[in-house]
Structure formats: C-alpha cells, structure tokens
Amino acid sequence: MNLHELAPQKGATKRRRRVGRGISAGQGASCGFGMRGQKSRSGTGTKPGFEGGQMPLYRRIPKLKHFPLVNRRQYTIINVGQLASLDPNSEVTLETLMDAGLITTNDGPLKILGNGELTIPLTIKAAAFTKGAQEKIEAAGGSCVVESSGSQKQ
C-alpha cells in the first residue's frame, strides 16, 4: 500500500450542501431558511438568551450571592469546655474523643475551639487550634501538639 492509494472509509465523507441552485436541486429558492422572518435574513440573528421581548430567563432568576467555597477545609470541631470531663494529664486525640463519646461523627481532622473553661492539664493532638483555645489549654498546664492532617475530608 502506498500513500497515494489511501482512501477514506465508505460513508466517512459527506458531500457539501449546494444551496440556491434551483428548486430541483432540493435547496433552491430560500436555501433551507424557510419563508420570511429574522432567521431567514443575513446577519447574526438574535443574541443568545433573547426571547422575543419577553423578560428572558436569565433576568427573571435572582442573582445568587455567597456561594460556598468548593475546597473548604472540613474539620471535626470541639470546644475547650467539653474537654474538662476527661482525665487529667491524658493525651487527647480524635480517636480518644470518639471513644469517650464527646464526638459522635468524624467530619475530618480535629480542630479545638476556645469556648468554655479548662482547669485540668491535657496533652491535645489536633490539626488546628484557635488562638483562644491554645491560650486556655496552656494556662491550665496542658500542651497543644499540631499534627498534620493527612486525610483531609473535603
């Protein structure tokens, strides 16, 4: 087989439409554009979304604001005040909080929030701490360990 012997497969090519060549050619007179009207004239026609003067759909629908962030980090959150029921000097992780029943669902890595008071020293391992939570934990004699959140739930 040589390059000059190549041919397209049967049915792969389609003849172009020759319009305006007489009525017996099939696309004569109005060339497939119908009778009269804006769509049969030359030029661009109507713009996308135009509904003939009726208020178009894209203007009838309200403008929506404040879309949620698509890649927002999702944390399992708990307040400092809820940790007061744990044993003093214990290590607190997401798993120990689930075992203790303080957290019922795992929504992602653990984040400690600063609402409430803490009087016992705890070693807390979490992905994130608020500034107020970190101050309260360290004031109670505990420590905050920031661990990297490998499996980030999004």
Curated annotation (Swiss-Prot):
Superkingdom to which the source organism belongs: Bacteria
The keyword Disulfide bond is annotated on this UniProt entry: no
GO CC annotation: cytosolic large ribosomal subunit
Region annotation (Disordered) ranges: 1-55
Organism: Gloeothece citriformis (strain PCC 7424)
HAMAP family: Ribosomal_uL15
Disulphide-bridged cysteine pairs: none
Annotated keywords: Ribonucleoprotein, Ribosomal protein, RNA-binding, rRNA-binding
Signal sequence coordinates: none
Pfam families: Ribosomal_L27A (PF00828)
Gly residues composition bias: residue spans: 23-35
Phylogenetic placement of the source organism: Bacteria, Bacillati, Cyanobacteriota, Cyanophyceae, Oscillatoriophycideae
Transmembrane segments: none
Family matches, as PROSITE patterns: RIBOSOMAL_L15 (PS00475)
Single GO MF descriptor: structural constituent of ribosome
UniProt subunit comment: Part of the 50S ribosomal subunit.
GO terms, biological process: translation
Main function: Binds to the 23S rRNA.
Family: Belongs to the universal ribosomal protein uL15 family.
Annotated protein name in UniProt: Large ribosomal subunit protein uL15
